[in-house]
Design a protein with these regions (language model features):
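Conserved small/polar residues in nucleotide/adenosyl-binding loops
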Residues: 251-258
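Catalytic cores of alpha/beta
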Residues: 182-190, 237-250
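Residue-level detector of alpha-helix initiation sites
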Residues: 158, 236-237
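Glycine-rich beta-strand-to-loop/alpha-helix junction loops that act as flexible
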Residues: 230-236, 253
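Active-site entrance/lid segments in N-terminal catalytic domains of soluble metabolic enzymes
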Residues: 1-226
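A generic structured-segment signal
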Residues: 227-231, 241
Length: 258
């Protein structure tokens, strides 16, 4: 089951698992794969605490960190507060949410914005928004690079040049999420080390193209740009599905060479 990803990180299985749970990150890495901590909702202090815990429990195995780092942040929305953005939610959506909560007898006090819960929610939104700006993202990256991570992943388009530069300076591979072959070409041209090709089965975050269609499309599209490692994501939950995706990648490589 060896692949370029296995050789790159010296892992036994070509399986990279994203999780917000530090315990899962450690378990995956110690089982022969590679765990990646989703940290966009962390403060720098929270990230330091989690990464220190991982370092103490992972027995020197490789792991990574995943963030959302925009290539640029411009436009009329850049100066809006969390409350401004909340007020932009259409009333139709609010009514629909209330109906669903009532239909399934869900206690919606927090979702309806009770005073205490609303303050907590706004604080969380504020932290999330700050981490999407360069100053907030840089602070998280500085914490991440102060630990022995081997991968930093960006789940929001082409990483900005300063993020790619930080990766090179710290000898850390940079991965980026994508959902179309056009995205892949832009990522490769920017200098990304690993492409995370996510089909619509992966929550629909990147687009509407199925994983088994998207992966070979991307493989063919980047062939002329060199041998860039690909991680397939979306709808891969069993050993059979994992084997199918690996076969898809191998067949596409052979076909492109003919």
């Amino acid at each position: 089951m060896k692949s370029p990803i296995c050789e790159m990180f010296d892992i036994e299985f070509p399986m990279v698992a994203f999780s917000h749970c530090r315990d899962v990150v450690v378990a995956v890495s110690k089982a022969g794969g590679m765990g990646v901590l989703g940290a966009v909702g962390h403060t720098p202090e929270m990230l330091e605490q989690d990464l220190k815990w991982i370092d103490e429990h992972i027995d020197g195995m490789p792991y990574g960190v995943d963030l959302l780092v925009p290539n640029k942040f411009e436009g009329k929305g850049s100066n809006k507060t969390s409350e401004d953005l909340r007020n932009m939610i259409p009333q139709e959506y609010r009514d629909f949410r209330a109906d669903v909560l009532k239909q399934y007898d869900v206690d919606g006090e927090i979702l309806r914005g009770g005073s205490e819960a609303k303050n907590i929610e706004l604080a969380s939104d504020s932290r999330f928004g700050k981490n999407l700006r360069q100053d907030g993202a840089q602070k998280l990256l500085e914490v991440a690079f102060s630990h022995p991570i081997q991968l930093i992943a960006n789940a929001l388009g082409v990483p900005p040049k300063w993020m790619l530069d930080m990766g090179k300076e710290n000898n850390v591979k940079v991965a980026a999420l994508l959902g179309a072959k056009e995205h892949a070409i832009k990522q490769v041209q920017a200098g990304v080390d690993i492409l995370v090709v996510s089909g619509t089965e992966g929550g629909g975050h990147c687009g509407s193209v199925s994983t088994m269609v998207l992966v070979p499309e991307v493989k063919r599209a980047i062939q002329e740009h060199g041998d860039i490692p690909i991680l397939a994501a979306g709808g891969i939950a069993t050993g059979e599905q994992m084997a199918g995706v690996m076969a898809c990648l191998l067949y596409t490589s052979d076909a492109a060479d003919e």
